[in-house]
Amino acid sequence: MEIDWGSLRIPDLIQVKFGSADSYTKSQIGSCMHIPASTVHSGGCHCGRVRFEVEAPAHLQLDVCNCSMCQRSGYKHLIVPADRFKLLSGQDSLTTYTFNTGTARHLFCSFCGIKSFYVPRSHPDGFSVNANCLDDGTVTGVTLRQVDGRHWEAHYPDGKGAYDV
């Protein structure tokens, strides 16, 4: 099988297996290829008033939480440190909902009602981006991890989660 190396895109290269008898070696790809450790993903709410960018890998590690809020909304968490999140527009369109301890700040677009990101209780110095609100074109794959949000304190015994990005 002949491969046109010049026509391959980065996602195609990621899928190449190295080391097996029927695969291509790293030297065939060439040392000039660089696969970025992270990608800038853009996204926003339904009406478009709230827009943001988030820096994360192209293959996302997402948390699926079983708490009442996440289950009802279908939220899939991409949790990032604050310095990897940038709100581009819509600050004046956001409204905040808090409950229980008040640590988590659930931010909703006051026009369309979508929660595209928020400040989670588990990561109060970062953001949880709703992966369902990311624009098409930059995500190459997703790995889902179940999180026990119903028993939050047991899931995060030290009171804070770690970042995967």
Region annotations inferred by a language model:
Residues 14-17, 22-165:
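A short Gly-Trp-Pro
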